[in-house]
Amino acid sequence: MKQLRLILACLALTFPLLTKAGERASFRYGMEWGVNSAIHVGSHSSYISGEGYLVDSRSLDFRSHINGEVMGLIGLEYKRLGLYVRSGYMGLQKEECVVPVLLRSSFALSRSGVEKHGSIYIEGGCGLQKSKPVSAVTGTGYVYRLRLSEKLALDMNGGLRISYSHPDVYDKYAEQKVPKESLGLSNSLNIGLALTIALVF
C-alpha cells in the first residue's frame, strides 16, 4: 500500500502546480478492460531439484499467449494534460497475474483536447502478488477518445507493455512446481502489446 499512497500523493500535488488561478481540472473515473500479450519473454531461474542438484535455467522465447485485464481508473484532466491512477487485475504472462497500481500521464495531440486527435501516454508502477516480490509494470501508447454523451466517453487504448516479474518455476525433470524453499531466483522480462477499451465519466 506504500506504493499506492505515494502515487496518490503525486497526483494530488502535481495538478495544483499545473492549473492557474480560477481554472479547474476535470475529475475523471471509469472502468477499463482488454487483453495483452507478452510476445518476447526473457527469463532466468535457479533452484535445487528434487535430486539435490542446482539447476540454473535461462531462456529467450517468442510467445503468443493472450492475457486479460480489468482495471478501474481515477484521474484529472487539465487542457492537454492528464494524470490517472489505474488498478485492478492483470495477467502478465501465462499463469501469472498481478494486482497493478499504475500512474499514467497523457498528453493530447491537439490544442483542442484529447477528443480531436487523441493522446499519447506513458505509465509505470508496480504489480502486487501474494508471497512474491513486487513486479514492475510500465508502458506507452496511444488513446483515441470517442464522446458518447456529455458525461460519458469511450477510450480505445493501444500500446507497448513491459513488465519485470517473478513467475512460478517448474522443475523440468520432475515436472512439478518448485517449492519456495528450493527456489533461488525467478526473474522474467516480458515485452508485448496491450489493447483495451475504457468507459470514462
PLM feature spans:
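Cleavable N-terminal export/targeting peptides
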Residues: 1-26
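Residue-level detector of intrinsically disordered/flexible regions characterized by low predicted structural confidence
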Residues: 4-7, 88, 106, 118, ...
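Short glycine/proline- and aromatic-enriched beta-strand/turn motifs that initiate or cap beta-hairpins
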Residues: 20-83, 87-89, 131, 190-200
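Non-catalytic effector/regulatory segments
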Residues: 27-36, 71, 118-122, 149, ...
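Predominantly the C-terminal beta-signal and adjacent terminal strand-loop region
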Residues: 40-44, 58-60, 89, 138, ...
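A subset of solvent-exposed loop/turn segments in beta-rich extracellular surface proteins, enriched
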Residues: 43-58, 98-125, 164-178
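Gram-negative (and chloroplast) outer-membrane scaffold detector with strong preference
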Residues: 71-141, 146-154
